[in-house]
Amino acid sequence: MAEERRRDDGGDVEVELSLRLRTGDDSTSADPAPATVAAEARRNLTIFYNGRMCAVNVTELQARTIISMASQGNFGKQQQQQIQGRDDHHYHQGESSSGGGVSTAAARHCDVAGSSSSHSGSGSGSATPPRPALVSPRAGLQAAAAAAPTMNQPPAASGLSMKRSLQRFLEKRKTRAAAPLYARR
């Protein structure tokens, strides 16, 4: 995905998003196995949003839809289709029906859709699992970005881990130096 920034006459910055896909080797070899084709149909998409990074596994159609919505800026107006009749395995694998909601893959990947489920108010204690509520694509992307590990940690947390790492390194170095293999003569 490429991002270009242009200035309008009014000084506003427009962001143009585009998706450039390469198919790889264009040689006329034998047809690939169906499993290979299915695996290549889904690719990782890295989303940088609100200072965070989230990598999700999406199809080309879903990636194009995300880019289209990002360039139009109408995240709040569109809603994804409600997911019904899927078992938990498919729910976490990122499977979606033909052209299903874009944010469903991101939400399932980051385990956020389960937290936005709605319970039926029957009160009878039925054993049916709660169904996920409708989530807008923007909410799905925000939740995916929130659940993703951040690359830029706060200075205090990264400073402590760096200090601990350095202490472990120095202790191991001292142990290696004292070992008979490295004994000084």
Curated annotation (Swiss-Prot):
Location of the Tify domain: 38-72
A Gene Ontology cellular-component term: nucleus
Region (Disordered): 77-185
Factors inducing expression: By abscisic acid (ABA), and drought and salt stresses. Down-regulated by jasmonate and wounding.
Keyword annotations: Jasmonic acid signaling pathway, Nucleus, Transcription, Transcription regulation, Ubl conjugation
Gene Ontology BP, a term: regulation of jasmonic acid mediated signaling pathway
Record motif Nuclear localization signal, residues: 162-169
Biased composition regions of type Low complexity, renumbered to the chain: 137-157
Family indicated by similarity: Belongs to the TIFY/JAZ family.
Role according to the record: Repressor of jasmonate responses.
Name of the protein: Protein TIFY 5
